[in-house]
Amino acid sequence: MAATPSAPAKSEMIDLTKLSPEQLIQIKQEFEQEITNVQDSLSTLHGCQAKYAGSKEALGTFQPNWENRQILVPLTSSMYVPGRVKDLNRFVIDIGTGYYIEKDLEGSKDYFKRRVEYVQEQIEKIEKIHLQKTRFYNSVMSVLEMKQAAAAKLQSQQQSQPAVTQSS
């Protein structure tokens, strides 16, 4: 028995063995799509986490003697312009959807630390969902394979029995 996919908040249980192979195939396909979506979400979150961790790490490399140091400033992911470090204690941070905030060095490090932790919490929540969906998917597959094997065995038995003919 497993919970229904459409009502995760309810504790309603269904007996997978009572479903037809066609119903099981439909549920299997739905869960394949849901698992793919969850995996895509996890991939996106891991990318965000790496971006935040990289930003925090970059802040850790700043040295007090870097004032007025020449650097390359990224305009895009593959295009840079020369620049100079003007103030080592003032950073502009992209917080998303076109908004930026200005923070000092410690505030910037703290911001990225908190973002990494928050994203990690979200990853853990989604990994639990992924595990639940995978377990249910595996249950559906087991029952489906059992039903398909039983159907194949029945068909094989029917084909091996000689046809009964009536003689007049």
UniProtKB/Swiss-Prot annotation:
GO BP annotation list: protein folding; RNA polymerase I assembly; RNA polymerase II core complex assembly; RNA polymerase III assembly
Disulfide pattern: none
UniProt key word Cell division: no
Pfam families: Prefoldin
InterPro entries, alphabetized: PFD_alpha_archaea, Prefoldin, Prefoldin_subunit_alpha
Sequence similarity: Belongs to the prefoldin subunit alpha family.
Matching NCBIfam families: prefoldin subunit alpha (TIGR00293)
Main function: Binds specifically to cytosolic chaperonin (c-CPN) and transfers target proteins to it. Binds to nascent polypeptide chain and promotes folding in an environment in which there are many competing pathways for nonnative proteins.
Subunit structure: Heterohexamer of two PFD-alpha type and four PFD-beta type subunits.
Name the UniProt record assigns to this protein: Probable prefoldin subunit 5
Organism: Drosophila melanogaster
Gene name in the database record: Pfdn5
